């Protein structure tokens, strides 16, 4: 072996390490410049690892044209069947162009192992195409692995009936004798939390404890919230007390649990303890406090926390924060204040915000603001029959049958049908 060849090999190895360092540390433009230099100046062929790193940086730096060029050179070098190059190509096309481009490439890859299948499944779930992800899983011609199930389970959470289907895939995962890991458990806790599956939450908690996953702070925070949604304050406190490092997520989860349980006093006390522990509250922590105030009708306290959120911590109030404040003010009959809050919103009020005001107006017989809220609500949700029914009931409760009848006719002309089981007889055909 000549000294020049040995020198070239040594230099190539050194530059590959440098390329890897750039790509893994997020210095993607530097990585791509180095790749172009290596590709143009070396007589020695670059290996699959170099191409996969270049594609990773193309995806991160959003460089689809260069990514296409690297793709062409990958094909020329016969690297398309390499799983690392294949996954990197899928990632690049999925992020820079579209999932359909990624699928087209996936169909062209000659040898697809589980890693490549999982990459395509993950692309579908990341862009919300869970149906396609499940169909692709069912079409797998290789043995699935933990990542296959994790991608599906994680993608299903938050979709319609997704929690139940996520649990079904968890059961399949167990049948395949795969061990759930932290990713699996985090998704499952979210799924169980959404449907109040208390027994399964305990099962997951027990499994995590036996397999030494339970100490992970993110999982513990998820368990606190999940137990809270099931109304099990005993388990909530048990998990929280076992946490050594309580970050803002953990504290927020505990506040949320108390709020859901209707214990506003404990929720506010927990918020104060969090501040004493020198943990800076975030927007979620304040939202949970406002929810606790709303459930308990603590309007003055809600106003204080709403102002502190912006004044003391410089946090921007979202639509959800405004909705909570409107809700608590409306609940205690402070309609004018609630309406002023809505008018001061920097963004367009949501149906939830107007609905909170309208519902409270009905309870208190406040017609003038009810009409304003209903008019705005019908603009936001013109096809929701519940909005017509609620305003109609308000009219009828104060003896304004003519307005109720006009509303019924407007509803009929608009093609909006009343929900089955509505108690408002005027709206029945």
UniProtKB/Swiss-Prot annotation:
Origin: domain of life: Eukaryota
Residue numbers spanned by region Type E motif: 353-428
Protein's UniProt keywords contain Translocase: no
GO molecular function, one term: RNA binding
Keyword Repeat appears in the UniProt entry: yes
Keyword list, A-Z: Repeat
InterPro entries: E_motif, Pentatricopeptide_rpt, PPR_At4g14850-like_plant, TPR-like_helical_dom_sf
PPR repeats by residue range: 11-45, 47-81, 82-112, 113-147, 148-180, 181-215, 216-246, 247-281, 282-312, 318-348
Family label: Belongs to the PPR family. PCMP-E subfamily.
Protein name as it appears in the record: Putative pentatricopeptide repeat-containing protein At1g03510
PROSITE patterns the record matches: PPR (PS51375)
Lineage of source species: Eukaryota, Viridiplantae, Streptophyta, Embryophyta, Tracheophyta
GO biological process per UniProt: RNA modification
């Amino acid at each position: 072996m000549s000294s020049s060849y040995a020198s070239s090999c040594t230099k190539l190895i050194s530059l590959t390490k440098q390329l890897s360092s750039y790509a893994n540390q997020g210095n993607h433009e530097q990585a791509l410049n180095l790749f172009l230099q290596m590709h143009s100046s070396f007589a020695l062929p670059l290996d699959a690892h170099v191409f996969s790193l270049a594609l990773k940086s193309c995806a991160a730096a959003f460089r689809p044209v260069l990514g296409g060029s690297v793709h062409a050179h990958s094909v020329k070098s016969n690297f398309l069947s390499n799983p690392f190059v294949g996954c990197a190509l899928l990632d690049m096309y999925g992020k820079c162009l579209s999932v359909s481009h990624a699928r087209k490439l996936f169909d062209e890859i000659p040898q697809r192992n589980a890693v490549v299948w999982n990459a395509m499944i993950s692309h579908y779930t990341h862009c919300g195409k869970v149906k396609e992800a499940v169909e692709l899983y069912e079409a797998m011609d290789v043995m699935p692995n933990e990542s296959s199930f994790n991608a599906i389970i994680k993608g299903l959470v938050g979709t319609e009936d997704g929690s139940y289907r996520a649990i079904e895939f968890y059961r399949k995962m167990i049948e395949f004798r795969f061990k759930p890991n932290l990713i699996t458990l985090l998704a499952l806790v979210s799924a169980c939390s959404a449907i109040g599956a208390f027994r399964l939450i305990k099962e997951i908690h027990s499994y995590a404890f036996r397999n030494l996953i339970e100490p992970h702070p993110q999982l513990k925070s998820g368990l606190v919230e999940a137990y809270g949604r099931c109304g099990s304050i005993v388990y909530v406190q048990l998990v929280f007390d076992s946490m050594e490092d309580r970050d803002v997520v953990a504290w927020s989860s505990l506040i949320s649990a108390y709020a859901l349980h209707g214990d506003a006093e404990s929720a506010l006390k927990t918020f104060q303890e969090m501040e004493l522990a020198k943990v800076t509250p975030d927007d979620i922590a304040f939202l949970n406090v406002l929810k606790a105030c709303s459930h308990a009708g603590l309007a003055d306290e809600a106003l204080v926390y709403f102002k502190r959120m912006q004044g003391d911590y410089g946090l921007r109030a979202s639509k959800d924060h405004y909705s909570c404040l409107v809700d608590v003010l409306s609940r205690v009959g402070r309609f004018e204040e609630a309406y002023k809050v809505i008018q001061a919103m920097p963004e367009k009020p949501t149906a939830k915000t107007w609905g909170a005001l309208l519902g409270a107006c009905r309870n208190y017989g406040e017609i003038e603001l009810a009409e304003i809220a209903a008019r705005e609500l019908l603009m936001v949700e013109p096809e929701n029959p519940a909005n017509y029914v609620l305003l109609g009931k308000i009219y009828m409760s104060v003896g304004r049958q003519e307005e109720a009848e006009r509303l019924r006719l407007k509803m009929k002309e608009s093609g909006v049908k009343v929900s089955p089981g509505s108690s408002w007889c005027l709206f029945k055909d």
